[in-house]
């Protein structure tokens, strides 16, 4: 049972960490597109391993051909964007191996992308990985868990309508 459901008895949606690492506030992402919430509210992960997992049961709306980002639609309608690293589109897909394609149904904690974090670092790019809920405005309550180490088995975002 989530924090909001315990407190208010409301239905909530829970989203799990897409990667293992330290969960940080979206405002700490060194890219204004994410830090200023232009794409929605969320969290970011400073990853310690190169595996990207589905944060919930969802459909793959768009797996970018380069593998640097994936857009999902949760079974409850949340629009989720996971962007692996910053400016990583410039790597033309080299450090990424994709395990899902557009239209696929995925389950919570299902592997979506393998990424070579060392290759991203060697290119001088950040590995910080934002996960944002693009339709944040559809929810009355938005709770994030940041400032601690997480795995794909930890809830990092809870939403209530």
Regions from the language model: what does each represent?
Residues 1-161:
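Contiguous, well-folded functional domains in the mature portion of proteins
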């Amino acid at each position: 049972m989530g924090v909001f459901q315990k407190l208010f008895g409301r239905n909530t949606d829970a989203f799990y960490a897409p990667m293992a690492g330290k969960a940080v506030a979206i405002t700490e992402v060194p890219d204004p597109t994410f830090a200023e919430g232009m794409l929605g509210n969320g969290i970011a992960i400073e990853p310690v391993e190169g595996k990207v997992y589905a944060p919930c049961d969802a459909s793959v709306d768009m797996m970018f051909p380069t593998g640097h980002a994936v857009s999902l639609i949760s079974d409850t309608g949340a629009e989720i964007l996971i962007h692996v690293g910053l400016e990583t589109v410039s790597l033309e897909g080299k450090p990424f191996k994709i395990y899902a394609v557009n239209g696929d149904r995925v389950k919570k904690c299902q592997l979506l992308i393998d990424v070579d974090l060392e290759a991203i670092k060697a290119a001088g790019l950040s590995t910080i990985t934002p996960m944002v809920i693009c339709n944040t405005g559809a929810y009355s309550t938005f709770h994030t868990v940041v400032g601690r180490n997480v795995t794909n088995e930890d809830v990092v975002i809870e939403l209530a309508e």
